[in-house]
Amino acid sequence: MFPLCRLLACRAQVPSHLVRYLSDSQPPFCIQRLDHLVLTVRSLDRTINFYTKVLGMEATTFKGGRKALSFGMQKINLHEAGKEFEPKASVPSPGSADLCLITETPLSTVVQHLKACGVPVEEGPVSRTGAVGEIISVYMRDPDQNLIEVSNYESDIKKK
């Protein structure tokens, strides 16, 4: 008898080399958090300027002269389009990211700062769902047109 995942894969015409990912087995490990992600950007300087001046991240340089933006316990590694480090995404492209960043600073203060920096708010404040609860968000674009969401957890707002 075929396992159900193989039967469904056949019906959905999933390529046979992907069928193994449809197994019911669980991995013997647990992912705890996101350490870093990579943004492919058109200009390192413009990106670093935006994320440090507008969002308050810290620019760092690590081995090989690579650039990153640090905040909290995470970082965003930066790859310049056409000069990516290996290994890299299959199709690295500026402007394809959608990031949600959490702050405890009231969004009214965030919006005032964005206006002072000349960064238009694309949408918000609006209610959304975050990883661990309801959030209120404002949206903007970075220099590569990535969608950047800055949010407060509603539970943090109610505590104040």
UniProtKB/Swiss-Prot annotation:
InterPro entries: Glyas_Bleomycin-R_OHBP_Dase (IPR029068), Glyas_Fos-R_dOase_dom (IPR004360), GlyoxalaseI/FosfomycinResist (IPR050383), VOC (IPR037523)
Gene3D superfamilies: 2,3-Dihydroxybiphenyl 1,2-Dioxygenase, domain 1 (3.10.180.10)
PROSITE patterns: VOC
Residue ranges occupied by any VOC domain in the UniProt entry: 33-153
Tree of life domain: Eukaryota
One Pfam short name: Glyoxalase
Entry similarity comment: Belongs to the glyoxalase I family.
Protein name per Swiss-Prot or TrEMBL: Glyoxalase domain-containing protein 5
Organism: Xenopus tropicalis
Lineage of the organism: Eukaryota, Metazoa, Chordata, Craniata, Vertebrata
